[in-house]
């Protein structure tokens, strides 16, 4: 678990799959992602199982959670992909699937936590993000 001021990043769980399906089938959420919709529960389960088979040093997807009252609410996912340990690079990815949490700074906090994790704990030299020029939130 990676703790921030108002958020935490945790390993994804099988119980998260229904949220993934809902998010990945929402065109507003996926408009800047390279994802083909519609996605089924079975497709997300297969993706999840593939993530479990991947060694953590090759990249990992983490759930973004915010604390509301006395519970943590899963609002999105972030991760490092295509980790190259020889060249010490990785691609960064993030999605805030719960639209009620857009434009509140949670994505920026999650980004900072993942970058810190990548540089300080994985000893990476370069972390990059491919961004559509029409995605202003990703460029902040």
Question: Could you say what each language-model-derived stretch is?
Answer:
Residues 101, 105-114:
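Conserved acetyl-CoA pyrophosphate-binding loop and the N-cap/start of the following alpha-helix
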Residues 1-100:
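GNAT-family acyltransferases
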Residues 72, 105, 135:
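Conserved G/P- and acidic residue-centered "switch" motifs that form tight phosphate/ATP-binding loops
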Residues 12, 117-119:
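Conserved hydrophobic/aromatic "anchor" residues
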Residues 120-130:
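Conserved GNAT acetyl-CoA-binding A-motif
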Residues 112, 116, 139-140:
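Core alpha-helical elements of the protein kinase catalytic domain
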Residues 108, 133-140:
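Conserved active-site alpha-helix within GNAT-family acetyltransferase domains
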